[in-house]
Regions:
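Short hydrophobic/aromatic beta-strand element in the GNAT-like acyltransferase core
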Residues: 51-55, 66, 96
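A short helix-loop-beta-strand connector motif used in the catalytic cores of GNAT acetyltransferases and
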Residues: 44-54, 74-77
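Short amphipathic alpha-helix that is part of the acyltransferase structural core
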Residues: 1-40, 53-57, 63
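Short, His- and charge-rich active-site/binding loops that engage polyanionic ligands
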Residues: 58-91
Length: 220
């Protein structure tokens, strides 16, 4: 397993296409999200010049995970798509970045998950950190999230915000991450969502997790 970081400005067209294809396979083909994107390629208006990416690769070199970081001084997903989740509390601060389009899924697992079981709403507003409990048994997922926090800290971030399903803060806390809700959860598109804040610091020694088999795919 290898995790690397790259900015959108540094990224060549070939790598951008690889990320877009991977995200399409995860979010559209596997999780069944209804996104406004061309067949085979998922990018949105937040994949702009100021975006940064974390990429997880298998030993074979195949892309098996990704995450996007956005500065809150620029337009970002929580601010533009989900402002109702943090009314009057939307950060616009160099020390706060947003985590979105977070996913960990091996190409061998593409299309194998039951879409009906996916926690994410099947619409463009479905930007969630993960697909419920089993995914947090994945050491790859924890490693990618910690790498995102470390990289964000190198960019000047002290905390990240992300749109998450109710309960994800508890799971993150159990995994050793320091989280809190910016505001009470709300129902959006039939799903209970909230704006989650994650501190950019090394995680604590986690409490033991008793989870099922891992099959990791998240968002946003």
């Amino acid at each position: 397993m290898n995790i690397s970081a790259v900015s959108r400005e540094e990224m060549g067209s070939q790598l951008l296409s690889e990320i877009a294809a991977y995200r399409y396979q995860v979010f559209v083909e596997t999780l069944g999200w209804q996104l406004d994107c061309p067949v085979g390629r998922e990018l949105d208006q937040f994949d702009h010049a100021n975006a940064h990416y974390l990429l997880l690769r298998e030993d074979s070199g195949a892309l098996a995970g990704c995450a996007r970081l956005l500065p809150t001084l620029q337009p970002y997903l929580l601010q533009q798509v989900f402002p109702m989740l943090a009314p009057g509390l939307l950060p616009k601060d160099a020390s706060v970045w947003e985590l979105s389009r977070f996913a960990v899924l091996s190409p061998a697992q593409f299309g194998t998950r039951q879409r009906a079981a996916a926690a994410e709403p099947r619409q463009s507003s479905g930007e969630l950190l993960n697909n419920a409990l089993p995914q947090f048994s994945s050491q790859q997922t924890i490693a990618l999230l910690q790498a995102a926090l470390d990289y964000a800290r190198s960019l000047g971030a002290r905390r990240l915000v992300t749109v998450s399903p109710v309960g994800i803060d508890r799971l993150l806390s159990m995994a050793g991450f320091n989280t809190c809700a910016l505001a009470p959860a709300q129902t959006v598109g039939g799903h209970r969502l909230f704006a989650c804040q994650i501190e950019c610091q090394a995680r604590r020694v986690p409490r033991p997790l008793v989870l099922g088999r891992s099959a990791s795919a998240q968002a946003a």
